[in-house]
């Protein structure tokens, strides 16, 4: 399982921990990922994702999972999230 957010693409970063004496130690900065179940209003079902906590705030800010995926760039989304996005857009187009 990769350490990458399914919705924002946030992943592991590398860098240095720098002490007061300017001693540098290489380290990995891991994203704060959690397994969540989000509800799609359009599909009327639950969808499981592994997302960063910051992504949860972004989903709520944009007005829910459906609105977030509609505006999200496909390059940032995981394959599963892209499939859900296509389902949502297809169902919205059929309803219109």
Swiss-Prot record:
Protein's name in the database: Large ribosomal subunit protein bL28
The keyword Ribosomal protein is assigned to this record: yes
Naturally occurring in which organism (per UniProt): Methylocella silvestris (strain DSM 15510 / CIP 108128 / LMG 27833 / NCIMB 13906 / BL2)
GO molecular function: structural constituent of ribosome
GO biological process per UniProt: translation
Keyword flag Ribosomal protein: yes
Listed GO CC annotations: cytosolic large ribosomal subunit
Pfam families, alphabetized: Ribosomal_L28
Family the UniProt entry places it in: Belongs to the bacterial ribosomal protein bL28 family.
PANTHER family the UniProt entry points to: 39S RIBOSOMAL PROTEIN L28, MITOCHONDRIAL (PTHR13528), LARGE RIBOSOMAL SUBUNIT PROTEIN BL28M (PTHR13528:SF2)
Keyword set, alphabetical order: Ribonucleoprotein, Ribosomal protein
Name of the encoding gene: rpmB
